[in-house]
């Protein structure tokens, strides 16, 4: 079992005079796992408030990504957002390797209510399956396939319409540890 509480001091990044004046951000994350013997289950959840996308200082760049699939923070046009996410997963030994499965859900909305850019609400669903196989004590191969579906809702005052982008990703590789 793990619990983490983080606070982000936005006043150290934004001075509130020439740029933004935001309340400090907060995340609370809980997670744990349990080994049932035949399979290991994982569960985690996170609450977040007053968070910003990685590139929140460049709202114009974010606006250009609205018609493509992006990190969900970019849907908020540089505004702070709040919400929660949950993730459940499982791994089990299969054919000498390990099969992996996970599902997740995120729900987020504007932290400050609506403004001139319009109110935004987002839901994201995701699922992934994978497999890893040890070739030796220090080397393994892996493959993962994932699918994510977003539902972005904008109010009438927004310059962007509602849209539901999705993405599918497949990757594979070999890992060697030293």
Regions found by a protein language model. Give the residues of each.
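Extracytoplasmic/periplasmic mature domains of Sec-exported, cell-envelope-associated bacterial proteins
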Residues: 24-26, 125, 137, 149, ...
């Amino acid at each position: 079992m793990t619990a983490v509480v983080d606070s982000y001091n936005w006043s150290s990044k934004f001075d509130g005079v020439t740029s933004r004046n935001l309340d400090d951000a907060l995340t609370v994350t809980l997670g744990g796992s349990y080994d049932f013997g035949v399979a290991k289950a994982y569960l985690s959840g996170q609450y977040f408030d007053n968070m910003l996308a990685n590139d929140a200082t460049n709202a114009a760049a974010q606006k250009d990504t609205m018609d493509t699939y992006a990190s969900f923070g970019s849907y908020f046009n540089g505004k702070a957002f709040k919400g929660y996410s949950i993730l459940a997963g499982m791994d089990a030994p299969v054919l000498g390797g390990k099969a992996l499965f996970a599902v997740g859900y995120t729900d987020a909305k504007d932290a400050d209510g609506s403004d001139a850019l319009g109110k935004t609400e987002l839901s994201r669903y995701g699922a992934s399956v994978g497999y890893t196989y040890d070739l030796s004590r220090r080397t393994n191969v892996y493959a993962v396939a994932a699918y994510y579906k977003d539902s972005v809702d904008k109010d009438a005052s927004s310059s962007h319409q509602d849209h539901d982008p999705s993405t599918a990703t497949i990757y594979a590789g070999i890992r060697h540890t030293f």
